[in-house]
């Protein structure tokens, strides 16, 4: 699983919680870093913040979907404090959406459901 978020506290929280749930987790601080990681690691699921510096979640998702490397079908779980998340999710063909601030007790089952379907 790839967790992409520019907030180090959120990255650490998700990394720890998902590892405790048995997932292999690789963190990234922005979309550019995530694409570099994906040269050597193919995640089953990508947990993706939409608002980040350098390369935001929109840019990352669009680049991922345009690639011809077998990565375009990886499910995305979007994280965002932005409103109108359903529009974002539909535009990016996301598997699920999670509004910030989030509750781990709601977030973890959603991610597990997406991962089990991947």
What kind of feature is each model-predicted range?
Residues 102-113:
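C-terminal output helix
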